[in-house]
Amino acid sequence: MGCDFTALANLGIRALSPYQAGKPVEELERELGISNIVKLASNENPLGLAASVQQALTAELSGLTRYPDANGFYLKQALAERFGVDEAQLTLGNGSNDLLELIARVFVSEQDEVIYAEHAFIVYPLVVQALNAKAVVVPASEWGHDLTAMAAAITERTKLIFIANPNNPTGTFLSAEALDAFLQQVPAHVMVVLDEAYTEYVEPSLRSPSFAWVNRFPNLVVCRTFSKAYGLAGLRVGYSVSDPQVAGLLNRLRQPFNCNSLALLAAQTVLDDAEYLAAAVETNHRGMAQLTEYCQARGLAYIPSSGNFLTIDMGRPAGPVYQQLLALGVIVRPIAGYGMPDHLRVSIGLAQENQRFMDALDEVLFR
């Protein structure tokens, strides 16, 4: 007699749908038998791996029979020195997604409330549902966070608030002044996660002093990643800065070897490669101008973005447009699952990759 294993699963897991990542190039090659594919779907760094990282990783290969440093001592030391934080404030993750889930698992219990914005990063609702907690989704304001409404949504049952700045998938950005005022309204018992996965693409003068805020607001956890501007998406390494007591709780639950040896070394190396980071930011700046000028010339509405992607309104259901682009060898990201069925999110690539997308979209929409 068979067993219904779904009935044995935790309540929050039963109706959970897996995270849908951007379509891999290899998958499209298998499906359509085509080559020369351009992938602009997952907000990856188009420059490829930094030369400094390639060299460092090659030298490390002989040590892969050993377990990694479970505490990431040298990476934490480098992060603390670079950003002026204490090593006791740092928690390392297998990408920042790992940390987002870890924070929720530490602080959120069944039936607690978790607040996030409409059109927020899809990992937030997945984490909340997995814990069988209550999601409080605050309607967006101009595709971004309505901080006034989010503050008003806080109740005695609220345990956690997720805020992405810049926001993914819309690219909207909150000023330091607006965030500071919001944090002052949040009760001390409510944790706030500030997800800054794309902060390196923001003009430095506009960025929030988020790490310094942790000393003013001990309930704040700031998460960042090496997957975007630093070009380490395939190695999966991120970090958070929080009150030392919060970091201690996170590290109780964190898997001891969640960052592998190559990831730790790569992150430590690229953190010192200012030239690579500057090139990544400049490439993104030029590519963003290329795509926004194209949209303006074609009369396509888009959401001004502070990230490394542009979200474009197709003026029609975007699903068929996405499929036609796939047939032309261009992978972008449909975001109907974010409540945006007419939009496609397009990662900023190299100039020639952006041109491939624009030529393909011309063929789909205008010919």
List the predicted regions and their residue ranges.
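Conserved PLP-binding catalytic core of the aspartate aminotransferase-like
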Residues: H285, C295-L328
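PLP-dependent enzyme catalytic core of the Aspartate aminotransferase-like
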Residues: Q324-L328, R333, G337-R367
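Active-site pre-lysine segment of PLP-dependent enzymes
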Residues: L147-E156, P169-V192, E196-A229
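Phosphate-binding glycine-rich loop
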Residues: T65-E113, L131
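N-terminal "arm"/small-domain region of PLP-dependent enzymes with the aminotransferase-like
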Residues: G2-R66
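PLP-dependent aminotransferase class I/II
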Residues: N71, N219-I303
